[in-house]
Amino acid sequence: MLGVLLVLHGSKIPEWKDVGIKYAEYLSRYFNLVEFGFLEFNKPTLSEALSNLLAKGANKIVVVPLLFATGTHFKRDIPRLLGIDGDEKKIQYMGKEIEIIIADPLGFDEKIGEVLVKRVNETYNKNY
């Protein structure tokens, strides 16, 4: 069964968790097993979120970093926190081999650009 694991950076500000909750709820319309985890500061951690998916029966997991670009978190931290070693895309869980695929960072996307335009206009109109 496919599991989707959203990865958020995390913050000392508790409201960061609300973003994870909202994106997980949104993706739950399309996928049965969706969890989110944070790289630092907030709970659930990435490892805890992975454990939740595995406990619910996920045997293939697509990891979706909510990051804009490739960097240290993407290249080093996410694989390490998921227990992925090198180019290996599998982990062992209760005697089973679990495939983990990490999606690319968000990068540039015109739909995200449209959201940015909307935010600029909302902010400008609210203040002028």
UniProtKB/Swiss-Prot annotation:
<keyword id="KW-0170">Cobalt</keyword>
<feature type="binding site">
    <location>
        <position position="43"/>
    </location>
    <ligand>
        <name>substrate</name>
    </ligand>
</feature>
<keyword id="KW-0479">Metal-binding</keyword>
<dbReference type="InterPro" id="IPR050963">
    <property type="entry name" value="Sirohydro_Cobaltochel/CbiX"/>
</dbReference>
<comment type="pathway">
    <text>Cofactor biosynthesis; adenosylcobalamin biosynthesis; cob(II)yrinate a,c-diamide from sirohydrochlorin (anaerobic route): step 1/10.</text>
</comment>
<keyword id="KW-0169">Cobalamin biosynthesis</keyword>
<feature type="active site" description="Proton acceptor">
    <location>
        <position position="9"/>
    </location>
</feature>
<dbReference type="InterPro" id="IPR002762">
    <property type="entry name" value="CbiX-like"/>
</dbReference>
<feature type="binding site">
    <location>
        <begin position="68"/>
        <end position="73"/>
    </location>
    <ligand>
        <name>substrate</name>
    </ligand>
</feature>
<comment type="function">
    <text>Catalyzes the insertion of Co(2+) into sirohydrochlorin as part of the anaerobic pathway to cobalamin biosynthesis.</text>
</comment>
<protein>
    <recommendedName>
        <fullName>Sirohydrochlorin cobaltochelatase</fullName>
        <ecNumber>4.99.1.3</ecNumber>
    </recommendedName>
</protein>
<dbReference type="GO" id="GO:0016852">
    <property type="term" value="F:sirohydrochlorin cobaltochelatase activity"/>
</dbReference>
<keyword id="KW-0456">Lyase</keyword>
<dbReference type="Pfam" id="PF01903">
    <property type="entry name" value="CbiX"/>
</dbReference>
<feature type="binding site">
    <location>
        <position position="9"/>
    </location>
    <ligand>
        <name>Co(2+)</name>
    </ligand>
</feature>
<dbReference type="GO" id="GO:0019251">
    <property type="term" value="P:anaerobic cobalamin biosynthetic process"/>
</dbReference>
<comment type="similarity">
    <text>Belongs to the CbiX family. CbiXS subfamily.</text>
</comment>
<feature type="binding site">
    <location>
        <position position="73"/>
    </location>
    <ligand>
        <name>Co(2+)</name>
    </ligand>
</feature>
<comment type="subunit">
    <text>Homotetramer; dimer of dimers.</text>
</comment>
<dbReference type="InterPro" id="IPR023652">
    <property type="entry name" value="SiroHydchlorin_Cochelatase"/>
</dbReference>
<dbReference type="GO" id="GO:0050897">
    <property type="term" value="F:cobalt ion binding"/>
</dbReference>
